[in-house]
Amino acid sequence: MDSDQTPLINPSLFEECAQNHFAAADSRSRRPFHIEPSYITSINDDEPQRITSEASAMNKRIHYYSKLSYPSGGGLIAPDHVLPAPEEIYVYSPLGTALKIDGSDGSEKNSSIVTIFMIWNTMMGTSILSIPWGIKQAGFTTGVCVLFLMGILTLYCCYRVVKSRGTIPLTDTSTWEFPDVCQYYFGSFGRWSSLLFSMVSLIGAMIVYWVLMSNFLFNTGKFIYNYVNDVNITDDVLSNNGTDKVICPNPDSTGPLNKSMDTYYGNGTNLEHFETWWSKTNTVPFYLVVLLLPLLGFRSPSFFAKFNILGTVSIIYLVSLVTLKAAHLGFHLQFSWNQVQTFFVPEFRVSFPQLTGILTLAFFIHNCIITLLKNNRNQKNNVRDLSIAYLLVGLTYVYVGVVVFASFPSPPLSKQCIEQNFLDNFPSSDILAFVARIFLLFQMMTVYPLLGYLVRVQLLGHIFGDIYPSIFHVLALNIAVVGVGVIMARFYPNIGGIIRFSGAACGLAFVFVYPSLIHMISLHRRGQLRIHSILIHVSIIVLGISNLIAQFFM
């Protein structure tokens, strides 16, 4: 009797058969192996399951179709209405077992290398433009140390997110995301609070994108106008001497000024007219509305998703640009802990929380890491692949931040001149910077509708249960999101400030608080919670709260 209850399909043979089975080009050739999922006694990913007599009857019924034939000799197949959905396919053995197989498993699983690259590509975003400024705010030595420490801390919290589903007993969590785990532990509060902080991260990213797109579009238009009209420029701003010019747009201010500081020689009337209608903060943010607002109304983001490769190209180009500029400019460093510096900054500065806020968003992937790891071919390698991806992201940030900071020409310029967007330290006439801005502008214009789609899915889906309740709901949401971006680009175009506030806010929940609380609650329910674990995870929560509070005093 015991042998009668054991699985009758060898797992290794089953995997080989299933791979060939689902690789068939004609899905109809697989139809005799479909049965209704409701007839499966239980679902378990680890081993085949015994099936009921109803499932056996269904199998015989489908085989019956294959026994019938046309008068001409052609065999019949089961009609479409008999078959389950593709995502509910079970492979059945007449000997009495059945296994559920996702049709995509055999062909769309990713190797570890692809998974690592996907995580790296997802995390690399606009924060990289502000890393050199963040290091300047923290001090060089402190900034590099904070980079490594924040990378380790966010990696550990991300590891806790990955393991969070496994802490829930007697429940199939294979399709759950982290907000579902939060709802399980914290009820409706967990659901709505996770939605709130997710909105903060998404809308914060959309605001940063709008500010940067306004910046890039302004400088691109300025470069084209000067080139077409043969306008000669003499910079009144502080700059170094040499072919690779680096400028200090705001020598007496930590934030960007809303005016041009260049002297032009050409047709003065046309130039004044151009400057009136082509202003970084007064006009260009409004021009973007005409370009981007219609794109937010698309029902599906699949078209824009095809351009994701541009993000990788942009990052590779930025790294190449930084390397080339550093090779020409050389390194300019002076290590000193003295607070009074003319051209350099001390190694430690009390404004270092500005960097921690930026890095919280720079290393933020906690709300979607479960989704990215689901398609990893070998689930046992999830933690290893996640760690490698974080290492690569951290090294990329360190490389760009350190090289830009170290190569900034001091003297004659002060390190205080490093801008929140380090591309602003290159004049609009710089061809290499012009190409970088073009790359980033086009990439952001394709990613922005994707972010808007995610906002629509999460917000309207939670409130109305439909991601497209009506064109009026969608239009009102899009106008509100775009309006916030325009207002910030007009009155507060400081991407460093926006990134650090949104990063500290969304990171408070998804990075610091929820993963730590869930881990402690699960240990407590199993009777395994110890004092050292409490101290460690409470300290992480306190760090997250302190990180957010500190942003208001910087």
UniProtKB/Swiss-Prot annotation:
Residue numbers on the Lumenal membrane side: 134-139, 219-276, 328-349, 409-430, 494-500
One GO-annotated biological process of the protein: positive regulation of TORC1 signaling
Organism listed in the record: Xenopus laevis (African clawed frog)
Protein name: Neutral amino acid transporter 9
Pfam families associated with the record: Aa_trans
Keyword Disulfide bond tagged: yes
Subunit and partners: Associated component of the Ragulator complex. Associated component of the Rag GTPases heterodimers.
Glycosylation sites: 232, 241, 258, 267
Subcellular location: Lysosome membrane; Late endosome membrane
